[in-house]
Amino acid sequence: MAKLIVSDVDVKDKKVLVRVDFNVPIKDGVIGDDNRIVAALPTIKYIIENGGKAILLSHLGRIKSDEDKKSLSLAPVAKRLGELLEKPVTFVPSNEGKEVEDAINNMKDGDVVVLENTRFQDIDNDFGKRESKNDPKLGEYWASLGDVFVNDAFGTAHRSHASNVGIATAMKAAGKPVAAGFLLEKEIKFLGNAVANPVHPFVTILGGAKVSDKIGVITNLIPKADHIIIGGGMAYTFLKAQGHNIGKSLVEDDKVEFAKELLEKAGDKLVLPIDHVAATEFNNDAASEVVGQDIPDNEMGLDIGPKTIELFKKTLEGAKTVVWNGPMGVFEMPNFAKGTLEVGRALADLPDATTIVGGGDSTAAAKQLGIAPKLTHISTGGGASLEYLEGKELPGIACVSDK
């Protein structure tokens, strides 16, 4: 069933609550990467250009003490949003009470207000984690502030919080519309369709350190994907399951048996490294060498080797849908980043393919290579992307009204 989108709703003269994902890196009040703010602009602009009042809610970081509040205020985010929109944005240093209500009542059509970090509610008022535990009273309070609710925060769609599910539940009970923003719509369209209804050949590239993080994804995708490329630290658990020597490489010994089962279930769908860049130490400056599929006892694999790069490129040839999540090696060390970067290049060069990238290192590689414009979609969710790829229903999407 298709979801209600913000463009399906009349926002003129309406107070529109928007759950955005402004969880950006901030150090000493300076925003390190404003991509998540930029990603929310289409939804915000649509609301204000069509005569609505945009009231924005977001979390930022994890709040465990009053000390955290000093460094995790959304004030710098509101300032940056104003610069990007080229118009004044009102920041309210609270998210409940008279100050909030007065600011909203003073809004004119086309105005934008940013409320303080929703997770401040996790330590305020001695009520326990009101935001993170989805206190229904908090959801009802926030819902009372608006006429329409738009969820545009895919990054928290796998969480059931007061600021997404809580507001949506209360809005629906009051007969008010609950819609997806354009960013959430894009995630549903590309990531959701890639899993539910991919154009074949469908290839998934999975990397990162742990098999345990990707078990659900692999299990869900075995029947759907034509090939599942496995790189990064998680590959060594599979190689050990095949009987290869992996030296001092990262391995999850308690997952070796499970890896064996997956190998049997997947048959030749799983594509594993056939050579490695190995070193004796986990260090960017460590002397390294290319070794075959078996790694010497005193060395550890830190990146895929040149033959593996060619094998993975060949596996990608002709693919029509590709989902990439996770690096092929220790991407944060420049000397062991080549495998990840080469896979990114191969992805960008695929003709007529839907290419979807998720996960921090894969996204960083895409940006480093400057290939982002050539990719169909870069997902804004970490854990949410993985759970979506596992085929799970995400609370932040399920709570949006159907058309």
Curated annotation (Swiss-Prot):
A Pfam family per the record: PGK
CDD domains cross-referenced by the UniProt entry: Phosphoglycerate_kinase
One Gene Ontology term of the molecular function aspect: ATP binding
Signal peptide bounds: none
GO CC annotations, alphabetized: cytosol
InterPro entries with a match to the protein in the record: Phosphoglycerate_kinase, Phosphoglycerate_kinase_CS, Phosphoglycerate_kinase_N, Phosphoglycerate_kinase_sf
Protein name: Phosphoglycerate kinase
Organism: Lactobacillus delbrueckii subsp. lactis
